[in-house]
Design a protein with these regions (language model features):
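Extracytoplasmic beta-strand/coil segments of soluble accessory domains associated
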Residues: 1-30, 46, 52
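Short sequence motifs at beta-strands and strand-loop junctions characteristic
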Residues: 4-6, 66, 94-97, 131-135, ...
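Short acidic/polar hinge/loop motifs at secondary-structure boundaries
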Residues: 12-13, 30-58, 77
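Outer-membrane beta-barrel channels and translocator barrels
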Residues: 19, 110-112, 146-150, 226-228
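Short strand-turn segments of transmembrane beta-barrel domains in outer membranes
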Residues: 63, 72-109, 119-130
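Transmembrane beta-barrel strands of outer-membrane/channel proteins
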Residues: 89-93, 118-122, 155-161, 235-239
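Residues on the lipid-exposed face of transmembrane beta-strands in outer-membrane beta-barrel proteins
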Residues: 103-107, 141-145, 217-223, 233, ...
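Acidic/polar loop-and-plug regions of large Gram-negative outer-membrane beta-barrel proteins
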Residues: 144, 152-222, 245-305
């Protein structure tokens, strides 16, 4: 389910429940945001390339996982000792300027019980609408040791630094408005983005822009106690660093330029305030207006930082 047409902005629904009510884990470590329960899949780009198995559980109940949830539970298990020896490299191209370069190498388990897997990839593209270009990297490293038949250790580190533009979900364009957009600008199937544009220097802007990197490091110990019992212990560390931009403006009652200026339509009519001939947002005019304003800027980009460090023992 794409949100705003942005890279990696997707959702998972299980039994009708959204991300906030579905516990998602990677190797048994919870991934949902601790404050609101959301899950940001752009932080885990490339995870499918190293996924060994996926475990799912519907609703609450007896479970081996650390965080059961009313909607259900998803546990993604990545490659480890089971990975076969070998390697691969690939280059993929797709629609909307998408390209992806990837390599992966696995040693397989040695006679002394060691194994490693390494993956690296880069993806870029223009997005499926105007001004939604993105760029991302992802990496994965796993080093595993089979100590004996009862014990094994696994060290895993992965992350996906990325930056991408989004199309605002609050553009206020109805189905009728989309038809008006095509007629107004004379472009059939116009993949319009109401807040996309450039300034006088050609720098790209959009109301929604995201930059983030949230690597995770974990150490897992598996102990097979007997044929009926086993104990899994994981220590993990996750460091999130990034930010997002959003457009802000004065209240409509106090300014000729308001937050509605950023929308694609107002009360059913296309918004023509600060628009270029092709419908893109005129950020050059906005900057000039702000500079000349007697009481400061009327429209501004806010930068919201999200810095956090998670760690735990399961």
């Amino acid at each position: 389910n794409k949100q705003g047409g942005g890279y990696g902005d997707s959702e998972i629904y299980m039994r009708g429940f959204d991300n906030t009510n579905v516990a998602t884990m990677i190797n048994g470590v919870p991934m949902n945001d601790m404050e609101n329960g959301n899950l940001y899949w752009s932080n885990w780009a490339g995870l499918s390339d190293v996924t060994r198995i996926m475990q799912t559980q519907r609703g609450l109940g007896a479970s081996k996982v650390s965080a059961p949830s009313v909607g259900g539970t998803i546990n993604i298990i990545t490659n480890g000792l089971e990975a076969k020896r070998g390697g691969a490299a690939s280059y993929q191209i797709g629609s909307n300027g998408m390209s992806k370069t990837l390599f992966t190498v696995s040693s397989g388990m040695s006679k002394k019980g060691w194994a490693f897997t390494v993956l690296g990839a880069r993806v870029q593209g223009d997005g499926n609408a105007q001004g939604l270009n993105y760029e991302g990297y992802n990496y994965f490293v796993n080093i595993a040791k089979r100590i004996n038949d009862a014990h094994q250790l696994s060290f895993t580190a992965f992350g996906a630094p990325q930056k991408h533009f989004q199309r605002s979900s609050s553009s206020a364009l109805t189905l009728a408005n989309w038809s008006l957009v095509e007629k107004k600008y004379g472009v059939k199937n116009y993949r319009y983005n109401a807040t996309y544009g450039v300034d006088a220097n050609g720098k790209q802007y959009s109301e929604d822009y995201n930059v983030y990197h949230k690597p995770q490091i974990s150490l897992n110990h598996q102990w097979l106690i007997n044929s009926k019992s086993n104990l899994s212990t994981s220590a993990y560390l996750s460091i999130g660093r990034g930010y997002g931009y959003a457009g802000e403006a004065n209240d409509a009652d106090y300014s000729d330029v308001s937050y509605k200026t950023l929308r694609g339509a107002n009360y059913g009519a296309l918004n023509m305030t600060y628009r270029n001939a092709d419908g893109t947002f005129d950020y050059a005019a906005i900057k000039a207006n702000n500079a000349a304003g007697e009481y400061g800027s009327k429209v501004a980009m806010t930068k919201s930082l999200n810095y956090h460090t998670w760690y735990g023992l399961l």
